[in-house]
A protein has these predicted regions:
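Conserved alpha/beta-domain cores
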Residues: 1-212
Length: 212
């Protein structure tokens, strides 16, 4: 609302990952990343959805009549987990103080996962659109929350202009895969809500490969 008062003409992109750093969602995000089964991942995503939807509703209401571009989750997944160097220190201490504890076993498991996620070139690694492809249900959840918020705001008379940015696309097939499934989610939500809203999907050319 403050941005509108200062003359903002819309939201160029919403960094949706900031919502995941919120204490309301942090535990569910970690469980989603660490899930061993799709069922466990879906349970975590179900907890994250209403938090995203609530935040999106606030954005649409504040930007009444102006475009709101939602950038789907962008950073590497390990950024939502404890830092590697902190885990190393904690594991080292626990091996001395609590060598046979469940706490040590949990920390060692987390350290193994975080180590496995380390990448030499994260910009082209498992993040952005590729995380959306590999973590089944993640970007579908975000898209559902976004269009549920848009439809429900529209029912209350808010003039919504939703747009979706698929991040870090390096190859046209990445865009095709994500766009196809997310457009289907948007259409499904509009059918469920009984209201039509604009549904624009695109990307930002932000890596050299995409430009070439």
């Amino acid at each position: 609302q403050r941005a509108v008062e200062f003359g903002a003409e819309g939201i160029g992109l919403t960094r949706t990952e900031h919502m995941f750093f919120d204490e309301r969602a942090r535990d569910a995000v970690v469980r989603m990343i660490l899930a061993d089964t799709q069922e466990a991942r879906d349970e975590a995503l179900a907890e994250m959805l209403p938090i995203q939807e609530q935040d999106f509703e606030g954005l649409f209401e504040a930007m009444d009549g102006k475009p709101v571009i939602m950038r789907l989750i962008d950073p590497p997944m390990h950024e939502f987990l404890p830092p590697y160097h902190e885990l190393i220190e904690e594991v080292a201490k626990l091996r001395v103080t609590k060598p046979d504890s469940d706490e040590l076993a949990e920390k060692e498991k987390m350290l193994e996962i975080v180590s496995g996620m380390w990448e030499t070139n994260p910009m082209m690694g498992l993040r952005g659109c590729r995380a959306g492809i590999m973590y089944e249900g993640l970007t579908e959840m975000q898209t559902r929350a976004y269009f549920q918020a848009a439809c429900r705001c529209a029912k209350r008379g808010v003039d919504v202009h939703p747009e979706v940015m698929i991040p870090l696309v390096g190859h046209v097939n990445e865009l095709k895969l994500e766009r196809e499934k997310l457009e289907a989610v948007a259409e499904e939500v509009m059918e469920e809500e009984g209201v039509e809203v604009p549904a624009i999907f695109g990307t930002m050319i932000e890596v050299p490969r995409a430009a070439l």
